[in-house]
Amino acid sequence: MFRKSLASLVPILLFVSLTNAQQRAEVSLQLGEQFFAAMLDSIYQNFNPPAFRLTGESGCGILKIIRESGGARTAAQFRDGQIRVPLAFSGNYAPPFVGCIEFSGWADSVLDLEFDQSSQKLIGRSRVIGVHLDGTGGMGSTAIAKLLQSSIDKRLNPIEIFPLDKLSFGVPIPSTGTLRMRAVGIRHEVSGGVLNLRVTYEFTKG
């Protein structure tokens, strides 16, 4: 009974303590590599691999981001203050005078996060910094890297991570009203092998 009363009392005290001045607080969310590994496993078990067109409109010129290739797995890694994203892939393209050829390998990429003030969204931009092709000794990797980055820029960047309105919510106050918790800002930090997201909330009477 005491716990139930205390649980009801806390939101009431928060609601009553609000004045005309807006009050703010910060909430921290910590995401580790294991979280993204489980999420990627679920994606590849339940959906088709993400696919991008590299060139033209014919059947040749498709790249798929797959779970694993050549011992490398698509993943999110938090290293040295960066979000490193190895991308395993397979696909095909048609170099001049050669015809359609198949390829596979993995790309080393970095995901840069930023808060877009105008759209009120946390967004990411993927940068390909290297491509490793299976069984070619590096031949053709530069061309594939350019095609991959161009396709990502056209069809993926910027990547919407968190729109702030999806992080906002209301807390019902019994017999009184609603405490609105509106997300007004978000910042991030990569350290200790985890991604830390800090969301700033503004508290108002609803």
Task: State where each predicted segment sits.
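Bacterial N-terminal signal peptides that target proteins for export
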Residues: 1-7
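N-terminal cationic amphipathic segment used for targeting or macromolecule association
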Residues: 5, 17-19, 122
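Bacterial N-terminal signal peptides
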Residues: 8-16
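Extracellular/lumenal and peripheral-membrane lipid-interaction modules
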Residues: 21-206
